[in-house]
């Protein structure tokens, strides 16, 4: 599937049930739950309540082309393409907020939000056209404006994998891509070296 939606409380996704994994019990680590599949496995792109999921599906379908030859991923735009983004300098580390600032009507739909939050992937609209976005992120802010996380300005294996899959999707559907990058290099870890 191109995009996976999971209801956060009852949905389950697994190859092997959590109890079939050696040394694991469902009470210890529920590898089939939406949180695990979105945060650790990176399989779930969107999670939420049933109403939130239905809303996310409608929103995603409204911005994507019907197929790779369709160029109907446009919408009427009343927002000025040349408007000033007065607060964008405060979004240097929080690139999800920067993308929302430059988008038509501040629209930004983040994909795989919970999987490696140091890499942002998602869709914006520019002059009515759907544009895929990839950006590294060094700061995460909650809905209340409080900083919830901080990351080094380096690329991780999981972040690169997340970006690569998103870029491949955009390429397959001829969706233009915008990249915002501010990195010093690659994350120095055994995981990075193994990959």
Task: Show where each model-derived region lies.
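Structured core elements
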Residues: 4-6, 14, 47, 98-101, ...
């Amino acid at each position: 599937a191109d995009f996976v939606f999971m209801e956060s409380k009852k949905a389950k996704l697994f190859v092997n049930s959590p109890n079939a994994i050696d040394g694991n019990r469902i009470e210890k680590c529920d590898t089939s739950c939406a949180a695990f599949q979105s945060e650790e496995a990176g399989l779930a792109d969107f999670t939420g309540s049933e109403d939130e999921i239905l809303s996310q599906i409608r929103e995603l379908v409204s911005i994507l082309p019907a197929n790779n030859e369709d160029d109907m991923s446009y919408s009427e735009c009343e927002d000025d393409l040349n408007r000033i983004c007065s607060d964008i300098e405060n979004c240097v580390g929080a690139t999800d907020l920067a993308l929302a600032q430059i988008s038509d009507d501040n629209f930004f739909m983040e994909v795989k939000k919970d999987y490696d939050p140091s890499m942002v992937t998602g869709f914006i609209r520019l002059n009515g056209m759907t544009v895929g976005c990839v950006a590294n992120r060094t700061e995460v802010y909650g809905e209340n404006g409080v900083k919830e996380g901080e990351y080094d300005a380096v690329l991780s294996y999981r972040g690169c994998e997340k970006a690569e899959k998103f870029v491949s999707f955009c390429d397959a559907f001829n969706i233009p891509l915008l990249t915002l990058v501010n990195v010093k290099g690659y994350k120095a870890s055994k995981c990075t070296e193994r990959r």
